[in-house]
Amino acid sequence: MTDQSHQCVIIGIAGASASGKSLIASTLYRELREQVGDEHIGVIPEDSYYKDQSHLSMEELVKTNYDHPNAMDHSLLFQHLQALKRGSAIELPVYSYVEHTRMQETVRVEPKKVIILEGILLLTDARLREEMNFSIFVDTPLDICLMRRIKRDVNERGRSMDSVMAQYQKTVRPMFLQFIEPSKQYADIIVPRGGKNRIAIDILKAKISQFFE
């Protein structure tokens, strides 16, 4: 973990797809933002760092294993975390779940006192772990994650149920068992029951609030 004297504090939230990571991250961001203001806290999703695949056909894009660490541009994410800690702004990539690739536009992110980083594969990369001041693993049963993923991907990402189930069986579950679950050992805090664990959220809020003092 990094020294807490750095200008920008990085908090990592990892766990299975649809485990409740984004809900915890958004809840912490919303409630802490009310206390300290937009200028002091931000959220960066690991999904923004899926590699640019604009050169591939849609058939090839659909076949990509998006749950393998090689699908992520962790080198760029690592560079961006270092830049934020130096006090420099970054250009955050924009990823389209419909087009299955990175968009041309970017979003400028200014340095903040606290950056909440959330994604499935964050703890699999030693470089990213070293940049985090502390890390969280959201530990939710896989059957619950699957039900949430079906609902999310069909309703929000334009997927069919058959395609969601096929992807889950072919890559999502195997990659969770191979990469994501073993990375739980690197987490400082393990949160059971997903994003609606109010007690865990309050404990995390208290911990993060220390960085604003």
Curated annotation (Swiss-Prot):
GO terms for cellular component: cytoplasm. Its main location: cytoplasm. CDD domains: UMPK. Belongs to the uridine kinase family. The keyword Nucleotide-binding applies. Gene3D superfamilies: P-loop containing nucleotide triphosphate hydrolases. GO terms for molecular function: ATP binding; cytidine kinase activity; uridine kinase activity. One of its GO terms (biological process) is UMP salvage. Disulfide bonds: none annotated. It catalyses: uridine + ATP = UMP + ADP + H(+); cytidine + ATP = CMP + ADP + H(+). It holds the Pfam family PRK. It is an enzyme of class 2 (transferase). Pathway: Pyrimidine metabolism; CTP biosynthesis via salvage pathway; CTP from cytidine: step 1/3; Pyrimidine metabolism; UMP biosynthesis via salvage pathway; UMP from uridine: step 1/1. It comes from the Bacteria. PANTHER family: URIDINE KINASE. ATP binds at G15, A16, S17, A18, S19, G20, K21, S22. It is found in: Cytoplasm. InterPro entries: P-loop_NTPase (IPR027417), PRK/URK (IPR006083), Uridine_kinase (IPR026008), Uridine_kinase-like (IPR000764). The keyword Cytoplasm applies. Keywords: ATP-binding, Cytoplasm, Kinase, Nucleotide-binding, Transferase. This is Uridine kinase. Its EC number is 2.7.1.48.
